[in-house]
């Protein structure tokens, strides 16, 4: 927990996985120099100004993410963090007043750090129930304010980012990770439609392009298998309900 509330004064927000950087991953700070990569646009404090600019430019939709750890700081609390819920409600209300439709990512590589340390990276079935609790909370909280949802951002990168020489065990772990996320995603779709039949809930696939090394048929077929496992597999499961690929290795 940020005992000093973080330099950005984010109340009640525990660390998430993306914030756990190894030593040396951040640049040293030097007095008098400006580092925009450290604070980016600081949307937390400037969302009203940012949304006003989006309205001025004529934008009709704005995609953003809800941070799981801002709603359930460790992922296992019985009650959500009200300050986190209020922040997103204020953002969505501001968007509605500006005539901008929010498109919300429910999970964007931001598993609460406490869950990661306790259960590993989506390698325990307990994640499914915890994710269900999280999505139930936000679907209820923002009913009428948010209609368009994405369950998992770039879910297929679990496979895409494996090295070419990954072992069968690494593939087995990656597919187990995906399986739990597929189940959690399906449950989120069910829950979301039960809470609000007007909800539109989809998936987000990272569009990575693969090219064959040569025109040799074996290279063409290998390239096709990369497309199937890296792109189509995750899309087919979530869009068609088809689980077609069973081989754990490339």
Regions found by a protein language model. Give the residues of each.
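N-terminal structural segment of carbohydrate-active enzymes
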Residues: 1-71, 75-78
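Aromatic-lined substrate-binding rim segments of carbohydrate-active enzymes
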Residues: 51-57, 62-108, 192
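Active-site region of glycoside hydrolase catalytic domains
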Residues: 1-21, 31, 75, 92-247
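Glycine-rich anion/phosphate-binding loops
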Residues: 38-48, 79-87, 124-133
């Amino acid at each position: 927990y940020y005992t000093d509330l973080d330099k950005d004064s984010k109340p009640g927000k525990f660390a998430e996985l993306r914030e756990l950087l190894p030593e040396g991953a951040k640049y040293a700070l030097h007095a008098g120099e400006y580092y925009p990569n450290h604070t980016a646009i600081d949307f937390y404090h400037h969302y009203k100004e940012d949304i006003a600019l989006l309205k001025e430019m004529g934008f009709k939709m704005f995609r953003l993410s809800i941070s799981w750890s801002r709603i359930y700081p460790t992922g296992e609390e019985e009650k959500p963090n009200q300050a986190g819920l209020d922040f997103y409600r204020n953002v969505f209300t501001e968007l509605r007043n500006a005539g901008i439709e929010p498109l919300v990512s429910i999970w964007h590589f931001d598993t609460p750090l406490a869950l990661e340390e306790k259960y590993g990276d989506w390698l325990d079935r307990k994640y499914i129930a915890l994710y269900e609790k999280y999505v139930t909370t936000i679907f209820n909280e923002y009913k009428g304010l948010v209609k368009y949802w994405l369950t998992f951002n770039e879910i297929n990168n679990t496979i895409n980012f494996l090295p070419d020489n990954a072992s069968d065990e690494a593939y087995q772990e990656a597919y187990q990770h995906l399986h739990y996320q597929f189940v959690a995603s399906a449950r989120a779709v069910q829950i979301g439609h039960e809470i609000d039949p007007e909800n539109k809930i989809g998936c987000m696939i990272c569009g990575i392009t693969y090219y064959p090394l040569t025109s040799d048929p074996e290279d063409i077929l290998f390239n096709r298998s990369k497309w199937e496992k890296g792109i189509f597999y995750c899309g087919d499961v979530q869009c068609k309900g088809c689980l077609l690929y069973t081989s754990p290795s490339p």
